[in-house]
Amino acid sequence: MTRSETLFEQAKKTIPGGVNSPVRAFNGVGGTPRFIEKADGAYIYDADGKAYIDYVGSWGPMILGHNHPSIREAVLKAVHNGLSFGAPTELEVIMAEKVIEMVPSMDQVRMVSSGTEATMSAIRLARGYTKRDKILKFEGCYHGHADCLLVKAGSGALTLGQPSSPGIPEDFAKHTLTAVYNDLESVQSFFDQYPEDIACIIIEPVAGNMNCIPPVPGFLEGLRALCDKYGALFIIDEVMTGFRVSRSGAQGHYGVTPDLTTLGKVIGGGMPVGAFGGKKDVMQYLAPAGPVYQAGTLSGNPIAMTAGLAQLDALCADGLYEELAAKTKRIAEGFKAAADKHGIPMAINYVGGMFGFFFTDEQHITRFDQVTRCNMDHFRAFYHGMLDEGVYLAPSAYEAGFLSMAHGDKEIEETLAAADRVLARMK
């Protein structure tokens, strides 16, 4: 047995399913998950010492690459001052100012410890502010594992064939309306039924938990207009896209202004950090300024703030996002070219530092139902072929891929050469 196989069997005795987040268990592709011992730059190294070119990046945060020197050194220095205080710090203020500078739609921001906390709190704030109960989300979009958001969700829930989870009371779930992503008519139909009951729309501006689905032209703008018309708040969930699609996130890339934004992943530099923020009049409804309660023992943790600030500072370098987008385009279009060469149907999507590939005869993938019809046997074969070649992709057909600034010509060329060999064997 490999060391990963031994560790997985050991883990299953004490951890449900052997993992602490379901998609890591490889249920979507079969086989044994790789247990990782270390990471550096564009590479991760498993418990057996094998190196992989990594396109998961801890599910998005590692935009500069693993173990980046500036983040590592900042964290090591900060540790000497203590790990957690449970009291306000100057670092929180500096972080808030930095986030607001980079995301102009925010007047104020609240730090939390995860993306789930961010979306859960933003939903509560929207309900409290509007005094309405219903929320509208989109089929296949994932906003963390809060009860109201695990209805027809994406990510691991979709991978496991459980887009809705047991344990969510029907009386609670009935307040969650689920529309079709990239379909404004489906959204309008809910506002026709509940014109004064919908507190907010929440959306992944690039759906990264049903693979990678960018918005069609006019879709985000249409949602903004509907929220304005019916008095609902527009929440853009940038936990995945924030500081990855552009310096100001997907909202900056597409030119759409939300009422509230949720953040996670990149903002923490690899540490557990989330945030939500928006217009001052809405944020002032949050305790202790207002009546909507939200709190967290480790919110604004000084080590996490240090890591996040080091990463955000580095992301302000000129030309960084243009370079990252060019690398991402090269990988996605390289996969497509190799698939075409070997007669294997494939469609691709990419935006900023995110990409997706789909084994399908359809040319353009814009909806959840198209993703569910893709050839999963081809995906599993490609996944394990690439893993054997030393390329680590997301172990699910419903997750986006991520590049980092550490991926250079060598890594990209080796990845595309591996894809060519694997696809040749799949013919």
From Swiss-Prot:
<dbReference type="InterPro" id="IPR004639">
    <property type="entry name" value="4pyrrol_synth_GluAld_NH2Trfase"/>
</dbReference>
<keyword id="KW-0627">Porphyrin biosynthesis</keyword>
<dbReference type="InterPro" id="IPR015422">
    <property type="entry name" value="PyrdxlP-dep_Trfase_small"/>
</dbReference>
<dbReference type="InterPro" id="IPR015421">
    <property type="entry name" value="PyrdxlP-dep_Trfase_major"/>
</dbReference>
<feature type="modified residue" description="N6-(pyridoxal phosphate)lysine">
    <location>
        <position position="265"/>
    </location>
</feature>
<dbReference type="GO" id="GO:0006782">
    <property type="term" value="P:protoporphyrinogen IX biosynthetic process"/>
</dbReference>
<keyword id="KW-0963">Cytoplasm</keyword>
<dbReference type="Pfam" id="PF00202">
    <property type="entry name" value="Aminotran_3"/>
</dbReference>
<dbReference type="GO" id="GO:0008483">
    <property type="term" value="F:transaminase activity"/>
</dbReference>
<dbReference type="GO" id="GO:0042286">
    <property type="term" value="F:glutamate-1-semialdehyde 2,1-aminomutase activity"/>
</dbReference>
<protein>
    <recommendedName>
        <fullName>Glutamate-1-semialdehyde 2,1-aminomutase</fullName>
        <ecNumber>5.4.3.8</ecNumber>
    </recommendedName>
</protein>
<dbReference type="GO" id="GO:0005737">
    <property type="term" value="C:cytoplasm"/>
</dbReference>
<dbReference type="InterPro" id="IPR005814">
    <property type="entry name" value="Aminotrans_3"/>
</dbReference>
<keyword id="KW-0663">Pyridoxal phosphate</keyword>
<comment type="pathway">
    <text>Porphyrin-containing compound metabolism; protoporphyrin-IX biosynthesis; 5-aminolevulinate from L-glutamyl-tRNA(Glu): step 2/2.</text>
</comment>
<comment type="similarity">
    <text>Belongs to the class-III pyridoxal-phosphate-dependent aminotransferase family. HemL subfamily.</text>
</comment>
<dbReference type="InterPro" id="IPR049704">
    <property type="entry name" value="Aminotrans_3_PPA_site"/>
</dbReference>
<keyword id="KW-0413">Isomerase</keyword>
<dbReference type="GO" id="GO:0030170">
    <property type="term" value="F:pyridoxal phosphate binding"/>
</dbReference>
<dbReference type="InterPro" id="IPR015424">
    <property type="entry name" value="PyrdxlP-dep_Trfase"/>
</dbReference>
<comment type="subunit">
    <text>Homodimer.</text>
</comment>
